[in-house]
């Protein structure tokens, strides 16, 4: 592979130096990737088969305990070889992504350089005016500076996207609050008439470089620095262009000070409006997520808590009816009380929520966050953020052993021991659904009610504040082929992440291997994208059903978990996820832009909008996403409050253990078969039968979760079992309410 060299033209060549050029040899990356691919192929084609043959010979000629031990060791060695192959391929794939990113950045930088060269040449060809001031040199200097700034932004954008694709935290972009800004320089006139600038005597340390750029060269305060060629100066000198007295071009330092020319399509959001500046110097904008909406007072819009578990204990609940699930808002103080122990706060919050009912889900009007953005959540009752985003609520520990104890598709755990009547709901009361957590606001933005359906653009300050810090969230999984296409498309657009790219990656991750249970016959997801960037998902199973291994990112809404829509209406979508995202958009005053799914999933359907088809090469090998588990999606407040309860108090939120200490009969397999069987039917009542079977399964799943919670050996196991108990109680009650006669 031939290394792409920077443009060497007189004017354009000055826009591909320093931070405006990825100073990495892509051929070295390609060579390293080829070596790792060769290692992986050798392990696959030679080492592992040879070891397997030796193991078989050993098994044929040796028996006894010694032979068994030897076979175990052989299996372990083969397993290590196979793991080495996997790791070699993963490393090679990352190197290929890096190689591609470097090539894209260099190609685009040279295209900008070529355009700058042509523009500057046309300016100089105008000739000296017969009268008036000769502004050619100043215009050339400005055009070079514009091209250089464009390339700096482009290289930073490519490097940050590459970092997100590789799952690493990208470096802070130049101009990020806290990064040093260089002291602006004072223009001066050289003795020979050349235009240049000299340092004012001191400069701050150089800002951190991008992922591609090498460290900037050191500077001497008494030596002129350069960006430009020999340009005879008859016009006013500009502080943004430097030349050497000898006329020979020198690679420039990264430019931070000075006003950057306005551009029509900057790829970055503006930096924080309150970022400190040095001597009036401006800094290149920083990358960051869009701000979340706030009320006019500057505080976060109160997030309505989900209708929760009733007073004190789960066993003291009275059956709830669909009439009790109203749209009355619950005061945030219900879960934000500061008095009492966490257990008392949890019980009080559940009691208050049970009395007033859940409130409808509220959508923000800010665009969805781009890939790699650090969304966070703020617990109810906390003070509005003033100096940074709040930490997301913690979950109840790893779900490992409970998946077997709680069982069922997705590791589901279960309800109270009595199958619930369709009209009355799950015994022990309901834990109805709640909205997903609302990200904390970045700056005061006035947001109208959702019903108006009119999106409001964030103010400049709010948009700038979006580039702030926060916990880095793991990127959405993406296949190598899709990552390359996205990078190329974004580079061509010369802009940030399109919401379609984010939505498509989420849709692909939901369709990845391991995100669907083997027992879930014909289960699939559909992802919708609205015109204002909202992402909504729906599947063809039940109401608010999510497989246990699936986590949804913070910015994703689930159509059937929206409590502002009646259970009966949500039941009418069951088994039809495309209809679900359409109705969700209509209900929330949104315009659907596209639906995203595989070709088979979109076959014989017409959503009335663009169909974005997922190809096999778009699907990543692993679809695990950072985000909310299924209880956090449908009942975020209950999940957050449960996380605050100490391990010793966990048993206090459970109903009493059954008198029979033996585990309940495991009928989850047969009951789940009844859930999916209606999907194979063409009967007009298949949706009703599907939901009826879901209620029965949810009741049995609660029973197993309750047993697992009372018999768990470790606090983490007990906590996870309780989460499963609450989840299946929510789903069972919601489904029963949906089936109840109007």
From Swiss-Prot:
Coiled coil: none annotated. Residues 421-432, 448-464 have a biased composition (Low complexity). Residues 167-471 are annotated as: Disordered. Disruption phenotype: Loss of DNA conjugation when disrupted in recipient strain; strain still secretes EsxB. Residues 205-218, 386-401, 433-447 have a biased composition (Pro residues). Residues 318-331, 358-368 have a biased composition (Polar residues). In the well characterized mc(2)155 strain this gene is interrupted and its 5' end is replaced; the last third of the protein is nearly identical in both strains (from residue 468 on in this entry). DNA conjugation in M.smegmatis is unidirectional with distinct donor and recipient strains; mc(2)155 is a donor strain while MKD8 is a recipient strain. Mutations in a donor strain that alter DNA transfer do not always alter DNA transfer in a recipient strain. May be involved in the ESX-1 / type VII specialized secretion system (T7SS), which exports several proteins including EsxA and EsxB. Involved in DNA conjugation in the recipient strain. This is Uncharacterized protein D806_0078. It comes from Mycolicibacterium smegmatis (strain MKD8). The lineage of its organism: Bacteria, Bacillati, Actinomycetota, Actinomycetes, Mycobacteriales.
């Amino acid at each position: 592979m031939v290394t792409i060299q920077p443009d060497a033209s007189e004017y354009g060549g000055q826009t591909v130096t320093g931070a405006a050029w990825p100073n990495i040899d892509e051929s070295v990356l390609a060579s390293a990737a080829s070596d790792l691919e060769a290692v992986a192929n050798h392990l696959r084609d030679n080492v592992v088969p040879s070891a397997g043959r030796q193991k078989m010979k050993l098994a044929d000629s040796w028996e006894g305990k010694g032979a068994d031990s030897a076979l175990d060791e052989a299996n372990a060695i083969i397993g290590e070889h196979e793991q080495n192959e996997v790791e070699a391929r993963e490393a090679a794939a990352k190197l290929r992504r890096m190689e591609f990113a470097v090539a894209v950045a260099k190609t685009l930088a040279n295209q900008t350089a070529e355009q700058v060269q042509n523009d500057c040449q046309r300016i100089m060809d105008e000739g000296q005016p017969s009268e008036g001031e000769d502004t050619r040199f100043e215009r050339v200097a400005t055009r070079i500076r514009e091209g250089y700034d464009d390339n700096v932004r482009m290289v930073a954008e490519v490097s940050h996207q590459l970092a997100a694709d590789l799952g690493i935290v990208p470096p802070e972009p130049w101009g990020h609050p806290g990064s040093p800004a260089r002291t602006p320089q004072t223009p001066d006139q050289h003795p020979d008439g050349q235009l240049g600038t000299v340092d004012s005597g001191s400069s701050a340390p150089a800002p951190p470089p991008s992922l591609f750029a090498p460290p900037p060269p050191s500077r001497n305060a008494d030596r002129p620095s350069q960006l430009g060629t020999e340009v005879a100066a008859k016009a006013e000198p500009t502080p943004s262009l430097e030349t050497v007295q000898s006329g020979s071009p020198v690679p420039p330092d990264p430019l931070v000070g000075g006003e950057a020319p306005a551009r029509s399509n900057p790829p970055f959001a503006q930096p924080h409006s309150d970022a400190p500046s040095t001597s009036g110097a401006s800094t290149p904008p920083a990358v960051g997520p869009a701000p979340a909406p706030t009320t006019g007072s500057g505080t976060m819009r109160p997030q309505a808590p989900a209708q929760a578990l009733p007073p004190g204990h789960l066993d003291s609940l009275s059956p709830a009816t669909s009439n009790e699930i109203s749209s009355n808002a619950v005061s945030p103080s219900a879960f934000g009380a500061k008095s009492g122990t966490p257990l008392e706060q949890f019980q009080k919050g559940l009691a208050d929520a049970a009395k007033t009912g859940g409130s409808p889900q509220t959508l923000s009007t800010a665009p969805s966050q781009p890939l790699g953005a650090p969304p966070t959540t703020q617990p109810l009752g906390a003070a509005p953020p003033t100096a940074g985003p709040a930490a997301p609520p913690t979950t109840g520990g790893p779900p490992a052993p409970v998946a077997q104890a709680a069982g069922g598709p997705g590791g589901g755990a279960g309800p109270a021991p009595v199958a619930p009547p369709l009209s009355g709901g799950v015994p022990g009361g309901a834990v109805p659904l709640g909205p997903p957590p609302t990200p904390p606001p970045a700056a005061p933005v006035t947001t109208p009610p959702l019903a108006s359906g009119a999106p409001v653009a964030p103010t400049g300050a709010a948009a700038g504040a979006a580039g702030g810090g926060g916990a880095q969230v793991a990127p959405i999984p993406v296949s190598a082929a899709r990552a390359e296409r996205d990078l190329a498309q974004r580079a061509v657009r010369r802009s940030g992440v399109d919401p379609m790219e984010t939505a498509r990656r989420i849709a692909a991750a939901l369709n990845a291997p391991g995100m669907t249970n083997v027992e879930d016959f014909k289960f699939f997801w559909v992802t919708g994208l609205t015109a204002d960037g909202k992402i909504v998902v729906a599947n063809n199973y039940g109401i608010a059903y999510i497989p246990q291994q699936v986590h949804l990112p913070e910015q994703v809404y689930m159509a059937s978990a929206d409590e502002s829509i009646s259970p009966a209406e949500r039941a009418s979508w069951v088994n039809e996820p495309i209809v679900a995202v359409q109705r969700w958009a209509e209900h929330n005053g949104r315009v659907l832009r596209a639906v995203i799914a595989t070709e088979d999933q979109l076959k014989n359907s017409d959503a009335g909008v663009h169909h974005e088809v997922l190809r096999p090469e778009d699907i990543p090998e692993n679809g695990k996403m950072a985000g909310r588990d299924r209880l956090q999606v449908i009942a975020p407040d209950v999940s957050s409050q449960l996380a605050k309860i100490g391990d010793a108090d966990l048993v206090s939120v459970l109903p009493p253990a059954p008198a029979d200490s033996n585990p309940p009969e495991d009928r989850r397999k047969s009951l789940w078969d009844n859930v999916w069987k209606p999907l194979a039917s063409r009967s007009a009542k298949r949706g009703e039968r599907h939901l009826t079977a879901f209620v029965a399964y949810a009741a049995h799943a609660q029973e197993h979760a309750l047993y697992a919670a009372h018999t768990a050996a470790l606090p983490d196991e007990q906590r996870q079992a309780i989460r499963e108990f609450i989840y299946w109680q929510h789903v069972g009650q919601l489904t029963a309410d949906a089936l109840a006669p109007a």
